[in-house]
UniProtKB/Swiss-Prot annotation:
Family statement drawn from the similarity comment of this UniProt entry: Belongs to the oleate hydratase family.
Cofactors (names): FAD
Gene: cla-hy
Domain of life (superkingdom): Bacteria
Temperature notes for this entry: Optimum temperature is 42 degrees Celsius for the hydration of linoleic acid and 37 degrees Celsius for the dehydration of 10-hydroxy-cis-12-octadecenoic acid (HYA).
Binding site for FAD: 87, 254, 300, 524
EC nos: 4.2.1.-
Subcellular location, record wording: Cell membrane; Cytoplasm
Residues annotated as catalytic: 205
Source species: Lactiplantibacillus plantarum
Protein name: Linoleate hydratase
One cellular component (GO) term of this entry: cytoplasm
Coiled-coil boundaries: none
Activity's dependence on pH: Optimum pH is 5.5 for the hydration of linoleic acid and for the dehydration of 10-hydroxy-cis-12-octadecenoic acid (HYA).
Class of the enzyme per the UniProt entry, highest EC level: lyase
Amino acid sequence: MGALFMVKSKAIMIGAGLSNMAAAVYLIQDGHWDGKDITFYGVDMHGANDGGATTDFTNEYWNKNHPMANTTGYVARGGRMLNYRTYVDLMDLLDRIPSVTEPGMTAAEDTRDFDAKHRTYDIARLMQGGKGIINAGKLGFNNKDRTLLTKLIMMPDSEETKLDNVSIAEYFKDDPHMFQTNFWYMWETTFAFRTQSSAQELRRYMHQMIYEFTQIEHLVGVNRTRYNQFESMILPLIKYLQGQGVTFIDNKIVKDWQFKDTPMQDEITVTGLVIEDAQTGETEEVEVDEDTAVIFTNGSITDSATMGDYNTPAPENMDYGVSASLWKKATERFYNLGTPDKFFNDRNASEWVSFTLTTKNHLFLNEIVRITTQEPGNALNSFLSTTPITPLNQKDVNMSIVVHHQPHFTTQQPNETVLWGYFLYPRRQGEFVNKPYIKMTGKEMAQELIGQLSKVDPGPGNIKDKEKENLDSIVNNIPVYMPYASALFNNRAKSDRPEVLPKHSTNLAFTGEFAEQPYQMIFTEQSAVRSGEIAAYHFAGVPMDNLVKTPRYDKDPKTLLKATKKMFD
């Protein structure tokens, strides 16, 4: 980190997601700042960790489907599986703020309490027609698979640039068998990796999640919040920060920068921001004085997302994305701030479609429980094709679902069920609905799910025989198209993301999933929180030695031995 050390006393946060909220908490608690000196500008007040009644989202900036014909039910664009073992910065953050649903508990205690009473143990991780529940504990490696994966695990941090611009497909180009293993089916759907994704990022995951590699088939290392992540994590942060006097200004898009003119082209000082009102289109200029830090979340995986409903597919939104556009403008001025096009100009590598399904009774839920033989809250069920569907003429996962512990929302009624699912490759053709997933309505996605369940139904009877009753029980199913959902995994070089504290920056820091941090893997609340923590400590003058210590299981002999044994199961 080569940023110029300049302690500030005020901050402007561009983006109101987890990483910037974390930065604000650390500025207040460890930097001893006054909350009134922190101002957030964002298009919404939740970032990617959202979740709520459909009506809460219909008028948000990113929803282009107006008017929605059906606004009943709930929606969450995505979901998060936590891991206490590695998400140490997240748990430190949540221990600093009170829960909004459990009096007397911190948000971390709330999650630990719920998780201790509802431990994850998935017994139907992979399912396939003709086989039902697959014994996924057998990872299916051959010796070439083991050799190449071991090379990733043993590659030191200092050599990871050898994987600059190397995709997973390229890394395993002489070993197509890897993509036919139970390991790959589970890894791609647990973390949303694709064959086009970065081998460099896969290496980081193998290092930081090496302990979970040894028990991936049951997801026993997965920890979950009591409710959706908005109500269990983001809302407590908002309430705490508002109580500290922090200002949140939403429906605002930061459109452009004003930088100080300096003789050196890599000296970065923000002097002003051009901000547009997302509803009126009016713009204003906000001055940034010398005592103000600018902390910017440079890219969001939910940028340009769109919603459909039960009878309407989610439309494609071709926007580059508001946060990525602002990042791109910064890179046009300074050469050491990364390459946003690597992440936001290749939808073929980054897009997927999710859905949130709400029912008025538990008929559908009970059918899923019967077929998968496990209670809600344990599952990430992935349905493996019975015929080749990939460019390599191989089988792959058609779709995946998460059956939450109920209720998943605090306002959810006792008779209601909410479940979530996604299609990692949205342009593949449906098996039971003859169109690409991206073109499907919420009803058609439900029909596709019933079809996939019917292939693995052990009987007696079959869910397909009750298709009408199950469909009639659905009050809504909200498809969400996310063009950049896996953008953070896109093939890249290490230099394609700016450092949290860029060299020669006097007041600008980057946070979130598109900021480069040593060792940290992305698409995790861990990396998001840590980036905010680093930015906060820098601008508050807190020594970096005070950062939460990151465990290195990849350097623990016992864990490595356990992983080696797992490879030969």
